[in-house]
Amino acid sequence: MAHQKLESVGSGMLDHRVRPGPVPHSQEPESEDMELPLEGYVPEGLELAALRPESPAPEEQECHNHSPDGDSSSDYVNNTSEEEDYDEGLPEEEEGITYYIRYCPEDDSYLEGMDCNGEEYLAHGAHPVDTDECQEAVEEWTDSAGPRPHSHEAEGSQDYPDGQLPIPEDEPSVLEAHDQEEDGHYCASKEGYQDYYPEEANGNTSASPYRLRRGDRDLEDQEEDIDQIVAEIKMSLSMTSITSASEASPEHGPEPGPGDSAEACPPIKASCSPSRHEARPKSLNLPPEAKHPGDPQRGFKPKTRTPEERPKWPHEQVCNGLEQPRKQQRSDLNGPVDNNNIPETKKVASFPSFVAVPGPCEPEDLIDGIIFAANYLGSTQLLSERNPSKNIRMMQAQEAVSRVKRMQKAAKIKKKANSEGDAQTLTEVDLFISAQRIKVLNADTQETMMDHALRTISYIADIGNIVVLMARRRMPRSASQDCIETTPGAQEGKKQYKMICHVFESEDAQLIAQSIGQAFSVAYQEFLRANGINPEDLSQKEYSDIINTQEMYNDDLIHFSNSENCKELQLEKHKGEILGVVVVESGWGSILPTVILANMMNGGPAARSGKLSIGDQIMSINGTSLVGLPLATCQGIIKGLKNQTQVKLNIVSCPPVTTVLIKRPDLKYQLGFSVQNGIICSLMRGGIAERGGVRVGHRIIEINGQSVVATAHEKIVQALSNSVGEIHMKTMPAAMFRLLTGQETPLYI
């Protein structure tokens, strides 16, 4: 039903300029950069097909079973494919998303981040840390991310390296890529396609539904800076360079033979028509037996690759035109050890050409691009929160359809009033879908009407035979604030973002939605391959099984449970005298988050009592619990003791050094934490490091019996990356370490 065309585009360097096509009433074609009024526009005289009644899918629905029967409404959302303009603030917490706690050694503070978005974790944008101690290190965040639900949502993770690709819950190849400012990727479910696309329909086989298309190489978008271009190249893994060729006209195009179409999807039942325009909307392809020299059908021979060429292809893309990544200040111990030292380009060729990605298309066909025939109904613009719920997304899609319908009706009335005769026919377009971008081409001239990078697509819904495509507006950095507005009555701090909504009509509406979802999955797999990661090594189920078999390292629990270590102390002091202590946080990841005694003033009440030791954890003071309170609050409580003469403390006697035991069965399992200058600065929740007792903000003192206090950062990273089996470490709070080593002057309270 749909054809494939080979799209000759460079890696993320497509021309975003709009080339006008013969659309009704000479309207200006649009791109993702142009401004639209909130009411949008449609070609005059366009008639909207009847909208099938649709109710939004319930929130708890995790998977749509796409079958030919019943309601075909489905929707895709890519909440994480944010452009840089929308990176202000972290997304709201959603279930199933991995959280991290970031420790900043410069100011002893903690930052909580979701998937480390905005924290610059990928090897393409980490901000230098303002400290002389920072050592250069190569970023290696290749976490095995938590699974993503398949309710056509792409939650978590954009971008390609400015963002993160969505990760399917049931997809065996799962990993988290960090610092994805735009996070755009979707991974489709493995279910729901076999019944909808059988190998044979009524016993008859037909030609491939897709065909490839050739096009001229487009120029680089002038408004994107080089970082965005590099990011798009790295993440999208755009198609290999193809010799540019002019579009063949319908009369002079090469006659396609039975072998000219690449077999993209299992053939599906389709009615054949001798002319494209007699039965719109129709897929572009006709079965071979229906083709004859008189047909005005456009046909293009796809460029094929031999099995020997395909493994080399991602390598060529990665190496073509890329700048060297910026130097990093952190090392994230989450990938196979060979990621540290072996150049990624040496590993790509050994991986399978393509990993099976659930969906109606073959992965290689989505790399090259596929074409769907559709009718363009119109576009409008909506204001939306950054990460609305799925139900709100569906309501927005229905609102866009309603607006377009109203505008069509108004245009029809205007035509009738002006006695201009019948309304013009619908604008026929080719919807080009690839793992890099989505383009809308005029069906007759093949000129670009709209062009959106895949990472900017936030949502797609099919409602009956209507397809709604939502994309984030792409603005220059200097104008990034222009796309953020606040609507009257909106909650304070709730920013509104401009979304451009395109509405199409097609018999293949559901297939289009599924194909775009699969394109996100393919883009994610190609991102892994470009970064030297074998997707087949990243089975989330296998990693989850390992986690489930490991028990929490309970050294702390045993220590806290021992009543001999829990003490209630009474300290005497003079009125107006400070307690004379320095306290620091125990560190996120500790079994009881409280404050630790890091230093005592000589001759002060705490030191005079002889009952306290450095490393003791303070549970309460004068009956006020300190567990779970911020450090500043705890310090304020201690300062409030100045005018008292007696202080009652509940403490747990602890050594200043914490013992950690990480069980890593194989090098392919990520450790799940990152290190900066020997300090643990982030930790993956639920990973083997957290289970082993790793704490954010702690300084690594010893690894497997070897002191690393004076060891260079790179050697610490190498030692951890190469460790397998049981990894024993000793750590202490970084602030305590600096006090004990004289790097900081204590401020007693």
Curated annotation (Swiss-Prot):
Classification via Pfam families: PDZ, PID
Domain of life: Eukaryota
STXBP1-binding: region residues: 185-270
CDD domains: PDZ1_APBA1_3-like (cd06720), PDZ2_APBA1_3-like (cd06793), PTB_X11 (cd01208)
Domain PDZ: 568-653, 659-735
Disulfide links within the chain: none
Keywords, ordered alphabetically: Phosphoprotein, Protein transport, Repeat, Transport
SMART domains membership: PDZ, PTB
Annotated positions of the Phosphoserine modification: 11, 208
Ranges of compositional bias, category Basic and acidic residues: 305-315
InterPro entries: APP-Binding, PDZ, PDZ_sf, PH-like_dom_sf, PTB/PI_dom
Any single Gene Ontology cellular-component annotation: plasma membrane
Record text on subunit structure and interactions: Part of a multimeric complex containing STXBP1 and syntaxin-1. Binds to the cytoplasmic domain of amyloid-beta protein, and to the nuclear factor NF-kappa-B/p65 via its PDZ domain. Interacts with the N-terminal domain of NECAB3.
Protein name in the entry: Amyloid-beta A4 precursor protein-binding family A member 2
Gene: APBA2
